[in-house]
């Protein structure tokens, strides 16, 4: 309450008092209820996926070793660097910013993938390992023992665009574009007798821009259902 006396005049000075009163303020109790309710996770499904991913990682690791002609720690950038640029003789590209040694980051491996299958397989290995460690193995540990749900934290001021962000865990960043990512999403399940309903704005920032600036070409493009990103 003491902060309110300081912050309210600042909101009025900046013309933001109506925004807080009509939009941001009423949103807070909604987010609080969402956080408290949480979301159900099918832990058994994730456990099965973890086992399958572990086997897939092991297969990919063995395939990398066979193609490289040597067994090494695929997770070690140093050892991978030695295999790619010394043993296989591939040309190094960019260097790391800190130590100034040949990089083995994703961009470098993507460049090398056309030259040797090892680089492509390492990319696949890393993606699978990230999904397994970040989501499949981590989510069950975040399930509340009493509610059986995962309870994230939402941040209404976390992004400059006004979009929500979330953390612990970041439920707004669950992958969806790959088959493995979609399988992870399938582990989030609705309450008994309920279904999930998903809706999303299409190009919401540009639509708001068209409304505010009144640009006739931009407005006409939206009304015609055109791809605004291609037009601009």
Give the positions of each predicted feature.
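Generic long, charged, amphipathic alpha-helical segments
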Residues: 224-232
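Conserved "right-hand" nucleotidyltransferase catalytic core of DNA-directed polymerases
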Residues: 1-179, 189, 193-195, 202-205, ...
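Conserved, non-catalytic sequence blocks in retroelement Pol enzymes and Pol-derived host proteins
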Residues: 74-75, 199, 221-224
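Long, highly charged, low-complexity internal segments
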Residues: 199, 209-210
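A generic local secondary-structure boundary/capping motif
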Residues: 185-187
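Signal-transmission/dimerization alpha-helices at domain junctions
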Residues: 211, 215-218
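Feature representing long, continuous alpha-helical segments
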Residues: 182, 206-207, 230-231
């Amino acid at each position: 309450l003491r902060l309110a006396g300081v912050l309210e005049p600042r909101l009025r000075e900046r013309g933001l008092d109506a925004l807080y009163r009509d939009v941001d303020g009423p949103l807070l109790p909604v987010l609080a209820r969402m956080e408290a309710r949480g979301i159900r996770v099918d832990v058994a499904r994730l456990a099965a996926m973890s086992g399958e991913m572990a086997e897939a990682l092991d297969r990919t690791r063995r395939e990398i070793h066979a193609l490289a002609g040597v067994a090494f720690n695929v997770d070690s950038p140093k050892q991978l660097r030695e295999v790619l640029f010394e043993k296989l003789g591939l040309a190094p590209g960019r260097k790391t910013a800190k130590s100034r040694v040949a990089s083995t980051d994703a961009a470098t491996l993507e460049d090398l993938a056309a030259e040797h299958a090892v680089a492509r397989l390492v990319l696949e290995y890393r993606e699978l390992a990230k999904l397994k460690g970040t989501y499949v193995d981590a989510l069950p540990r975040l399930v509340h023992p009493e509610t059986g749900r995962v309870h994230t934290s939402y941040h209404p001021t976390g992004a400059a665009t006004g979009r929500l962000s979330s953390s612990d865990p970041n439920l707004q960043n669950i992958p969806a574009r790959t088959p493995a990512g979609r399988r992870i999403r399938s582990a989030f399940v609705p309450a008994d007798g309920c279904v999930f309903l998903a809706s999303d704005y299409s190009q919401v920032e540009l639509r708001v821009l068209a409304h505010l600036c009144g640009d006739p070409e931009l407005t006409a493009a939206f009304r015609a259902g055109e791809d605004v990103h291609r037009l601009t």
